[in-house]
Amino acid sequence: DDLSSFSIEKKEVRPVWITISIPKNTEKGAYNAKVLITSPTTKQQELNISLDVIDMTLPEPAKWTFHLDQWQHPSAVARVNKVSVWSDEHFKALKPQMQMLANLGQKVITTTLNKDPWHVQTFDPYEDMIIWTKEKDGSWSYDYTVFDKWVSFMMDLGIKKMINCYSIVPWNNEIHYKDAATGKFVDVVAKPGTDEFTKIW
């Protein structure tokens, strides 16, 4: 949870995750500290924690060889934080989440070429990062504004080895685009091997 506080019923167990950042120049050895637990109705309690630092230093996460590929879901972050998708407030809310992922050695940026390529397998549909527009003369144009902003944002955090683009063959072969003649968005089925697929792709 990214909450500053929450209520717990009495006799209920709630795990707590504690992250400790260790500077690279820290000498090896055992380090002790206390965790203070406070409540408005009970006295303060102390828990002892011990941390053993070994004589080994990890390289920067971007240099780790393990290929970590956790899919990102920006739309979910927008809903939880009650902000508009792709707004400045959205990217501000995304930063701590994605920075945490970068610090774990994430190598891949998840992007969506079209709206919800997995046909809503998650609570929040995936928003498209590229706006496809069928112009009045039948030609196609593509707005990469969101795609470029998202990729640059992730690369600035240190995630830059690979970009996964989903998907040339989306769920149900459905393509989402804007019809310039009507100003409305249209969903059309374009199966591989058909004239419609060739024309769109």
Language-model region placement:
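Short beta-strand and strand-turn-strand segments in soluble, beta-rich domains
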Residues: 1-4, 26, 43
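Aromatic-lined carbohydrate-binding surfaces of glycoside hydrolases
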Residues: 21, 32-39, 45-201
